[in-house]
Amino acid sequence: MEGPLSVFGERTTGESIRSQNVMAAASIANIVKSSLGPVGLDKMLVDDIGDVTITNDGATILKLLEVEHPAAKVLCELADLQDKEVGDGTTSVVIIAAELLKNADELVKQKIHPTSIIGGYRLACKEAVRYINENLIINTDELGKDCLINAAKTSMSSKIIGIDGDFFANMVVDAVLAVKYTDVKGQPRYPVNSINVLKAHGRSQKESMLINGYALNCVVASQGMPKRIVNAKIACLDFSLQKTKMKLGVQVVITDPEKLDQIRKREADITKERIQKILATGANVILTTGGIDDMCLKYFVESMTIAVRRVLKRDLKRIAKASGATILSTLASLEGEESFEASMLGQAEEVVQERICDDELILIKNTKARTSASIILRGANDFMCDEMERSLHDALCVVKRVLESKSVVPGGGAVEAALSIYLENYATSMGSREQLAIAEFARSLLIIPNTLAVNAAQDSTDLVAKLRAFHNEAQVNPERKNLKWIGLDLVNGKPRDNRQTGVFEPTMVKVKSLKFATEAAITILRIDDLIKLHPESKDDKRGGTYEDAVHSGAIED
């Protein structure tokens, strides 16, 4: 007999669900743990259709995993959020969140209420962020461009392009500085999305290059067109310039065969008139996302205009933004009249088709509204080029964040070790139950230097103990304050001054990863009940016929 409330599913409550959630989070963290740090290893992921991805990027690994457990999904989304918000630190944010959960579960087993733990974690996170901002940040104005290059090198050190760190770091910094513009509030902005990254497999990765201007992976639509135009006026069209045909279903009854020729002529004339309206404004470069008819190409060749077809929508948007053009999906106004004005054109100093590496590319140089830059990556194969692109994206985001926040923190586990010592001392000053949670938060942060050392095949216990001793000395003894920059040297297996060595990370990466990891851990920690509904069975009659409903007594006849 069913109770007054029957749930069509499984219900898991209390300690059991909390343990399940912690195990799910720990298993996700274990997948990405070995890819952390400059000597982290790569993962090979093969999807259901056999596509192979080789990567070291935490967000990419977790995006490609098909995770079923709801708590594990929270961590996968967490890595994605960190990637979108900051661009780097995706692996460490997942590892910290899982460790916070694991330690919280231990406290719950000791009969500490989850609410007390949540309060302690929130307090510890707030205190940690305050400590970073007051004691650990280094102003980039003191260090200049070298600081940006070092931050980019630190980001790349764990990636495939880390071997040529100096070469790529300079390229990344130059690319980000090239797209700088000032917004309406007078603040400098660095839109990383406007840097076009093209991949061409072949040659070595050292033969990658930075181009000042927007590189378009297309060629001119006809051989008769000019390959170079100075003082370009660019029209960006989101429709095809092909002979207009009547829509399907339109029937025209013709009594005179000559009328058929007139209809065909009119179809051709509609497109011809559109082209004439565009060319009349002085446009000499036409970019369209659709196709261009051979008949239409003739008009462009005659007027010595460059026309490019099948341009990607993404590229068209970026070019329009850089050149000041307006993207048009139709020439018709609300009244139905077709027109094209000169104000809709974008401007650039030069548009030229060049052979770069082994491919023909169209370069749009010195655009009027904003500057643009393109990076062409070379690599042994497609897997390598894809991973280089992901590594480059992380480095570009890091440089952008350093320029915007104007501050960096030392890398190599220095921040986590300093926070661990500080929060342990802070916990002892608390007279409430939150003391235990803050102490566990401090212990959880040590997972980062620990994992870095393990991945580098070093003695993690010994290294982390030495690191903590240095940071304790820095906080206790004001005369030895400079020891707070001490982090790990993973190649030689000893602590070193990471400020002098130039191992830097953007402050935002550390602050955001702490905040995101704490919030994710709290979200999962608050769960004490899981109700998983059964999928509706096929022989379920609830969606049956009228006769079935009458027969079951659900409705009266």
Swiss-Prot record:
Catalytic activity, reaction form: ATP + H2O = ADP + phosphate + H(+)
UniProt feature, compositional bias: Basic and acidic residues: 538-550
SUPFAM superfamilies, sorted: GroEL apical domain-like (SSF52029), GroEL equatorial domain-like (SSF48592), GroEL-intermediate domain like (SSF54849)
Residues recorded as bearing N-acetylmethionine in the entry: 1
Region Disordered: start-end pairs: 538-557
Binding-site residues, ADP: 37, 89-92, 158-159, 412, 505
Primary location group: cytoplasm
GO biological process per UniProt: protein folding
One GO MF term: ATP-dependent protein folding chaperone
EC number: 3.6.1.-
Keyword annotations from UniProtKB, A to Z: Acetylation, ATP-binding, Chaperone, Cytoplasm, Cytoskeleton, Hydrolase, Magnesium, Metal-binding, Nucleotide-binding, Phosphoprotein
One Pfam family recorded for the sequence: Cpn60_TCP1
Enzymatic class: hydrolase
Record-listed Phosphoserine modification sites: 6, 552
Residues modified as Phosphotyrosine: 181
NCBIfam families: chap_CCT_alpha, thermosome_alpha, thermosome_beta
Protein family per UniProt: Belongs to the TCP-1 chaperonin family.
Record protein name field: T-complex protein 1 subunit alpha
Record organism: Monodelphis domestica (Gray short-tailed opossum)
Gene from which the chain derives: TCP1
